[in-house]
């Protein structure tokens, strides 16, 4: 049998007719139309509940205590990992050099070097803070930290 355009038909079950609900008990989906009895889901706009609403029970965000805060200082200070300094040329490193190398985001006003990984070059940090471990690693590589 050859395939012809006028003989084409969709596969069985590929196209089903839309179920019409609420059109009499004979259809099997009359009266409540598949929504059950009463409750918010049976009503118009039902099932739309606010995020965090727990049915009248005191919600989790009100049961738990308030803790901590976001430091505005932390937002202004960028963290630079010590191994990232190896991307720069050996020598003097200041805040402008870190910004130029995209190691510090534009919103930051200060930077602090934190120890992670190894240092292979000699750096002189100027006007950039460093943790005790990072300072020791920079000095071990032959560099120095000038506040």
Swiss-Prot record:
GO terms for molecular function: rRNA binding; structural constituent of ribosome. Keywords: Ribonucleoprotein, Ribosomal protein, RNA-binding, rRNA-binding. Residues 1-61 are annotated as: Disordered. One of its GO terms (biological process) is translation. Residues 23-33 have a biased composition (Gly residues). InterPro entries: Ribosomal_uL15, Ribosomal_uL15/eL18, Ribosomal_uL15/eL18_sf, Ribosomal_uL15_bac-type, Ribosomal_uL15_CS. Residues 1-20 have a biased composition (Basic and acidic residues). NCBIfam families: rplO_bact. Part of the 50S ribosomal subunit. Binds to the 23S rRNA. This is Large ribosomal subunit protein uL15. It comes from Xanthomonas euvesicatoria pv. vesicatoria (strain 85-10) (Xanthomonas campestris pv. vesicatoria).
């Amino acid at each position: 049998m050859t395939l012809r355009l006028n003989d084409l038909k969709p596969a069985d079950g590929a196209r089903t007719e839309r179920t019409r609900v609420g059109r009499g008990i004979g259809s099997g989906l009359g009266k409540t139309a598949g929504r059950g009895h009463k409750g918010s889901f049976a009503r118009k706009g039902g099932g739309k509940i606010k995020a965090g609403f727990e049915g009248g029970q005191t919600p989790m965000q009100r049961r738990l205590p308030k803790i901590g805060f976001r430091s505005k200082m932390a937002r202004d200070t960028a963290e630079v990992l010590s191994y990232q300094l190896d991307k720069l040329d050996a020598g003097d490193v200041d805040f402008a050099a870190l910004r130029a190398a995209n190691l510090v985001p534009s919103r930051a006003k200060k930077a602090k070097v934190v120890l992670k990984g190894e240092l292979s070059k000699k750096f002189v940090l100027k006007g950039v803070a460093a943790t005790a471990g990072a300072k020791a690693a920079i000095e071990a590589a032959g560099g120095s930290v000038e506040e």
